[in-house]
């Protein structure tokens, strides 16, 4: 079972469409969440409860909520799990309160392999924070962690790809340097690497997506850069990511393509064995449409796009400012620490947060 604990996000990661669309961040009260979770599990019979959101560990009452849930969840054999966690606010207490029934996997989103590129995408985490978080996990008895990255980010070089492998290797080395690690146990670090797809309504809507050939070359280089059997690498198929990029920035001219591709047998495309890339490409060609036009060219900062008429609060000017800061590798603080004038709350008459409180 899954329950949404908050909506929106204060972090401002420049690649994240949901983080911009769902501003401002709103969190549900811990007591209401506890009651809803209890009713949900009682009425469905689920034995695992996921506290879902874009950034669950940013919930201001998370510790209180976990205490409330642990009053009844272990008795009902209901385990608690958190989605991908931020490495800058992970704690020993968080582990203890989510493992009373059974351990779930730990996934940490580092997103990029070098600090320079993390600054470009505004992923405000450092190696020291990654090291601290993994130390807590290993000391708590975990012997495996998953690190989530993206490939094909703006300004990315092969050095950044090598940084992914180096980060994973440093986590492996960290495990073997700890005196409290389990005797006779090995460590497993899994690199999960997605292909970056530029999305509308984000500061990176202006950038072209890497070609499938470029992404495949980067995937090959990543595999060659990993030299430890303790590190496993998973990555997304570049051709399915290409189609995602096409339709993410597409317009009404793509509607006939979808209908025709369906008639030619393109459905259940999320399943690898059902994905017919050649059929999609032939359909584009037969209808006289160049799919690369939509996702593999830069978009002008003043260009009118198929989504320009949509107003979700955040202004075009703010996206341009964030894009320019990205090119300069300048970061932006979480918006509950200082208002950066994105426009998300302009219809409600003021800032989204009371800045006398640090909610993160």
Residue ranges and their predicted role:
Residues 8-9, 13-16, 33, 82, ...:
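Conserved structural-core and active-site-/substrate-pathway-adjacent residues in large, well-folded domains
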Residues 2-31, 341-359:
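Canonical Radical SAM [4Fe-4S] cluster-binding loop centered on the CxxxCxxC motif
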Residues 60, 90-94, 116-121, 151-159, ...:
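Flexible glycine/acidic-rich beta-alpha junction loops that bind and position SAM and/or redox cofactors
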Residues 25-29, 36, 46, 56, ...:
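Terminal amphipathic helices with adjacent charged low-complexity linkers/tails
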Residues 2, 14-24, 46-54, 113-120, ...:
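Glycine- and acidic
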Residues 39-190, 194, 198:
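Conserved SAM/AdoMet-binding glycine-rich loop
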